[in-house]
């Protein structure tokens, strides 16, 4: 039990004319990533953990006699336009909140509950509102029969559901834009290290994002891995720029995570942004399943991430009722409270240490590797890596594996946190079948790297 007192975190100040703080609240149980965090009677929306308090910033600025910037506080009619009306279907709402367009396969793409020959995917809405999770499986990616793109995206903020779906639909297209196309001018890698000249955030190459090349972990294919890593960095950069200048999606206080996997032959290329996660299910010498985490949860608790944020004047502290959840805040205002150190969107924090540069890694598939599970934090907050691998290994069929994980996570939420709201869950299970192992090691990475050299790198 954690007692919530009437004290304030370091740096917390009232706006001029603000009412006195409410008395101390009763002790509440600790819970992971609550969507709304209450402090001293005031509600600060935790982006990445929940909605953001635009009204609070408006009150602070008006009390100080400062005009509200249009780029930070868009007019009401613009915000309404960013959330299009959707007609409810009779007979109840779908748990996955997927539209007919999501359910219709397009060029090997599946973006709703279902399964393909190589993967299964499933999402279920929690009880916090609209489902902000999105997912995608794209077979024959880049027109290659043995190549698959998978991704899960966890939106947050008032328009997180729009941001996550935008990234789901556009990011793989940006990634494939420079594969297998002639006549495109090579884009310099400076695109991911240059500053955005029109405000709203700066992208810089950081030491913690540099992955050592030519090691056993990377499969001893430094040249091929470097080419693919550069391509992935470009795609993430251009995707974030698309969100920044999008005319109908307000991403100032909204954003999304992204964890993606490209599989070809023996090769897996993983790109991660935020706190969604990819876990490998493999077998040990006794043929027993165990879990290998392929990504790192990029949260403000990581020393290198925290150092970057503080260097750029961002603040990091936890709310009293969530002492284990570090959040990122603006230098002078206690908002938005982002529970991750990297994300698409969230442009209010892009000048203060938040970046959209993914952590990129490579894994060579072995004969012991069976599947990869990509999931949002609605799953990982209540199930361990080992539990998820065990659940998938015991599923009745590969087609039902993702649904089995989501339903298990929902039950775990009700059992472990009965007073908390259930988070949205999205899962993609990618099965590493024997057909993918017939190619010699490294052949997939080499094929994709050759395609990059032929196609150039124009992603804009």
Curated annotation (Swiss-Prot):
Keyword Metal-binding: yes
Reactions accelerated catalytically: O-phospho-L-seryl-[protein] + H2O = L-seryl-[protein] + phosphate; O-phospho-L-threonyl-[protein] + H2O = L-threonyl-[protein] + phosphate
Positions contributing to Mn(2+) 2 binding: 154, 377, 423
GO biological process per UniProt: regulation of intracellular signal transduction
EC number: 3.1.3.16
Skewed-composition ranges (Basic and acidic residues): 100-109, 201-210
Record's keyword terms, sorted: Hydrolase, Magnesium, Manganese, Metal-binding, Protein phosphatase
Cofactor: Mg(2+); Mn(2+)
Enzyme class: hydrolase
Residue ranges annotated for the PPM-type phosphatase domain, each copy included: 118-432
Record's cofactor remark: Binds 2 magnesium or manganese ions per subunit.
Binding residue positions for Mn(2+) 1: 154-155
Superkingdom as given in the UniProt entry: Eukaryota
Pfam families assigned: PP2C
Disulfide linkage: none
Family: Belongs to the PP2C family.
Name recorded for this polypeptide: Probable protein phosphatase 2C 38
């Amino acid at each position: 039990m954690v007692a919530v007192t009437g004290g304030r975190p370091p740096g917390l100040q009232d706006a001029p004319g603000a009412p006195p703080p409410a008395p101390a609240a009763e002790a509440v149980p600790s819970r992971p990533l609550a969507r709304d965090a209450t402090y001293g009677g005031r509600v600060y929306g935790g982006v990445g953990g929940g909605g953001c308090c635009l009204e609070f910033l408006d009150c602070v600025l008006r009390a100080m006699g400062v005009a509200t910037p249009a780029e930070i506080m868009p007019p009401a009619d613009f915000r309404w336009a960013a959330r299009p009306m959707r007609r409810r279907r009779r007979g109840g709402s779908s748990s996955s909140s997927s539209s007919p367009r999501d359910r219709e396969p397009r060029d090997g793409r599946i973006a709703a509950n279902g399964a393909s020959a190589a993967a299964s995917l499933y999402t279920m809405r929690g009880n916090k509102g609209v489902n902000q999770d999105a997912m995608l499986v794209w077979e024959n990616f880049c027109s290659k029969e043995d190549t698959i793109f998978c991704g899960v995206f966890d939106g947050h903020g008032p328009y997180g559901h729009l941001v996550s779906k935008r990234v789901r639909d556009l990011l793989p297209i940006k990634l494939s834009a420079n594969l297998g196309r002639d006549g495109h001018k090579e884009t310099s890698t400076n695109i991911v290290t240059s500053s955005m000249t029109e405000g709203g955030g700066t992208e810089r190459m950081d030491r913690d994002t540099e992955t050592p090349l030519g090691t056993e972990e990377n499969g001893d294919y430094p040249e091929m891995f470097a080419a693919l890593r550069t391509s992935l960095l470009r795609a993430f950069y251009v995707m974030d720029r698309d969100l920044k200048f999008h005319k109908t999606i307000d991403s100032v206080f909204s954003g999304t995570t992204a964890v993606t996997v490209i599989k070809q032959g023996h090769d897996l290329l993983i790109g991660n942004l935020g706190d969604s996660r990819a876990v490998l299910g493999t077998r040990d010498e006794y043929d027993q399943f165990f879990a290998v985490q392929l990504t790192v949860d990029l949260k403000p608790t990581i020393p290198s991430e925290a150092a970057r944020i503080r260097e750029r004047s961002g603040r990091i502290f936890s709310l009293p009722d969530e002492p284990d959840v570090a959040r990122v805040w603006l230098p002078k205002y206690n908002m938005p409270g982002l529970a991750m150190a990297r994300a698409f969107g969230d442009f209010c924090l892009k000048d203060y240490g938040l970046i959209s540069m993914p952590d990129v890694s490579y894994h060579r598939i072995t004969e012991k590797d069976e599947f990869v599970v990509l999931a949002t934090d609605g799953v990982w907050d209540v199930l361990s890596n080992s539990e998820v691998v065990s659940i998938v290994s015991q599923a009745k069929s590969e087609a039902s594996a993702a649904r089995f994980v989501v339903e298990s996570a929902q039950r775990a939420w009700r059992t472990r946190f009965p007073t908390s709201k259930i988070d949205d869950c999205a899962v993609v299970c990618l099965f590493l079948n024997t057909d993918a192992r017939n190619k010699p090691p490294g052949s997939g990475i080499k094929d994709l790297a050759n395609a990059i050299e032929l196609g150039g790198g124009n992603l804009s």
